[in-house]
Amino acid sequence: MFCPFCRHPDSRVVDSRTSDDGLSIRRRRQCPECGRRFSTTETASLSVIKRNGVVEPFSREKIVTGVRKACQGRPVTDTDLAVLAQRVEEAIRATGASQIEANDIGLSILPPLRELDEVAYLRFASVYQGFDSLDDFEAAIAQLRVAHAATPDADAL
């Protein structure tokens, strides 16, 4: 690793720590040439294969932006959205794949969004899964009701 101050081609790791979210490693380094210290952050790369075949880096912010639209007017905070995006990223990284299709990201958003807010879930699912009629909404609502019936302390729809 090049020193950002003197461009020396080597550095020594002084300290390594896992980040709070557990998805990256923060390393404190020292340059043997100039003696200055600097920090680096290392994360495993994760790429998204879009529907048109273009590959781009995974972005948690894109998840938040997409889900925020479904949550407009709902009692969902920015913190809730950040936690949802983190859960989605953790689920994706747990697969061990370095590339994931955009469709799979959408599928992994649905379960935590359903737990967060069922109305937002229906909005997101209606666009993502291409609901064409009231029958599609009724089927999704019926699935939510079945899930509520299976959960003893769930609120009624």
Curated annotation (Swiss-Prot):
It comes from the Bacteria. Keywords: ATP-binding, DNA-binding, Metal-binding, Nucleotide-binding, Repressor, Transcription, Transcription regulation, Zinc, Zinc-finger. Residues 46-136 form the ATP-cone domain. Binds 1 zinc ion. It comes from Clavibacter sepedonicus (Clavibacter michiganensis subsp. sepedonicus). HAMAP family: NrdR. PROSITE patterns: ATP_CONE (PS51161). Negatively regulates transcription of bacterial ribonucleotide reductase nrd genes and operons by binding to NrdR-boxes. A zinc finger (unnamed) spans 3-34. This is Transcriptional repressor NrdR. Its cofactor is Zn(2+). The lineage of its organism: Bacteria, Bacillati, Actinomycetota, Actinomycetes, Micrococcales. Belongs to the NrdR family. One of its GO terms (biological process) is negative regulation of DNA-templated transcription. It holds the Pfam family Zn_ribbon_NrdR. InterPro entries: ATP-cone_dom (IPR005144), NrdR-like_N (IPR055173), RNR_NrdR-like (IPR003796). One of its GO terms (molecular function) is DNA binding.
